[in-house]
Amino acid sequence: MRKGLIILGDLKDQDLIWLSRAGQVRDCSANEILIAEGRDVEDLFFVTEGSFAVRVGGREVAEVGVGDVLGEMSFVEKRPPSASVVAKGSARALAVPRAALLEEFRRNDAFAARFYRALAVFLSDRLRSMTEGDDGELDEGLLDTIHVAGDRMLRLIDLLEGAPAA
């Protein structure tokens, strides 16, 4: 199960509807760059189809796929990414503009709280797995919401069906 789903686990259906409307579908072909190392990222990406290679200095360090979230570090820090993300084949992601998210957070405190909590749990889990060794397992506390997160990812994909690609 993709750990990026952690973020969707804390969101509500109304949040998914907003994300699907605020974002734009990005269809990528093989070897297309979604995020370029060292270049500003203005979107937060939710992978909805296919897989992407995460590359540092041209060397693949990870593979991400459906359910993963990309650009989250640049979203939090507003710094250029330290890695590139490249489509491994035909792939699709929902690109939600950072500016739109921040504006919605100003209007909707409850959404902002849910989103930032989910992002904090996601980043905490990532840090814990790096410092304690990643055994591929999710924390027991996260298992309670992971089925909800999977359902939410499927709902997001359904909401995007037929959406025009960028």
Q: What residues fall within each predicted segment?
A:
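Conserved active-site beta-strand element of glycosyltransferases/polysaccharide synthases
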Residues: 94
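A small-molecule sensor/coupling module
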Residues: 15-16, 81, 101-141
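A generic structural signal for residues located within well-ordered alpha-helices
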Residues: 3, 11-14, 42, 65, ...
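Cyclic nucleotide-binding regulatory module and flanking cytosolic helices
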Residues: 1-30
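Phosphate-/nucleic-acid-contacting segments
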Residues: 137-166
